[in-house]
Amino acid sequence: MEFKRCSGILMPISSLPGGYGIGSMGKPAHDFVDFLAKAGQTIWQILPVGPTGYADSPYQSCSAFAGNPYFIDLDMLAADGLLTKKDYAAINWGGDAAHVDYGTLYEKRFAVLRKAYANFLKKRPVPGYETPYPDDWYRFQFLSSDWLPDYCLYMAIKEANGMVDWQQWPRALRVREPEALAEFKAEHAGEIEFWAFLQYEFDRQWRALHAYAKEKGVAIMGDIPIYVAADSADAWAGRELFETDAEGKPRRVAGCPPDYFAADGQLWGNPLYDWDYHRRTGYAWWILRIRHALSIYDILRIDHFRGFDTYWAIPAGETTARNGRWEQGPRMELFRALHNALGSLPIVAEDLGEMFDSVRELLAESGFPGMKVLQFAFTGEDSVDLPHNYPRNCVAYPGTHDNNTLTGWFAKELTAAQRKQAVDYFALTKQEGTVRGMLRGVLASTAALAIIPMADWLEETAAARMNTPGQAQGNWQWRADAKKLTPALAAEIRVLTERYFRAAK
């Protein structure tokens, strides 16, 4: 795909302002769509919206299909008669409005959501004899039948076992013995349905938000990681999809080889795909996954695109990534299968880092736009990440969720020589401001699409950084201050957007 010249803003759902501990799909999200429209933006990029677990990373979700219950808007549940304000308004969701307190959310949010479910049970319609799904509750379950039952069962079993990794469950449940699963379903039917209810509410609220964004001329760019988490419904219920043994334990796991930045490489621990199985089944699971993603997003960014060309496979049990080896991925065969099944693929490829020539060839053959990041540019050489070198078919960023804010980066991460190079390159002045000058450079580039993180428009310090790779705790927490998302800021963004011919018509 190729974009017409345009721009957008990266703003995670979790970072939206609001009163209940984390951003949501209700008024905070709708207000942000209004802000984008006033600012002349046509794309809202978000991070993955799956349920989060250990370390709160949206890239390590327990499902490739489910939505995060934390994003369900409580006021919308109240408007539907499933809650009252007193059920949640007085709860302390964390003492710092600028950061998500995931521990507090975990302790308190589900109790409120269970109240909503209890009220839902009182209102739930009984299906008629003539049709299996006379309303949207049954319709949602029917349309989600490829993944919802396994996800809800996984979550119910996980909760019954103290939320431990599924590899630590009783063996009969771990290996999915039919009798054990049937017995659990019979004894925990209500708990299983609770998890279905959460996905139903997520779906209702998300589709309302998506429709509102379309009405305002704003497309939503979603994001999915290439791999699923080891502790996920996908790995538990679909072990044939991965390189696993009879017990479902990975034989090899994902990561990155040693490099200049990490002498031992990066050991991610995700189960690797059994690409031979996917090939034999016509990539059916991938078609299902991408079809689902494109049903909720207008554009899809896929993380770690290089893994479709070659991927680093590390024997399970290794403590570092040193002893891995490169293996061949599915390359264009996968994308041809996706195209044949789904038609045009509005995909953006995350192609950052060192790349083999074969990865560049795959990107070119796919036609997907890659990414360029300003913060990688100032090496003292004529870097491909300097704006004058951007190809048209790419997405330009000052930084991604894995980078510091521009303010933090310029102040702390550049040498004196690099800082001088940046000042000279952009002709930065005190009058314009350092950050505004660099954003000007990204917007002025020839890249068809420019995406600016909201934290950079707000000129936030390093405290607003979303993620520091390699840091286990303290990530994914930043939240924007609603008072800073002003009409004046929207007007300023629109002026710059129009100046560089990126504004919505």
Predicted regions and their residues:
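Catalytic domains of carbohydrate-active enzymes, especially glycoside hydrolases
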Residues: 2, 27-52, 295-297, 442
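N-terminal catalytic cores of NTP/NDP-binding nucleotidyl/phosphoryl-transfer enzymes
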Residues: 8, 12-31
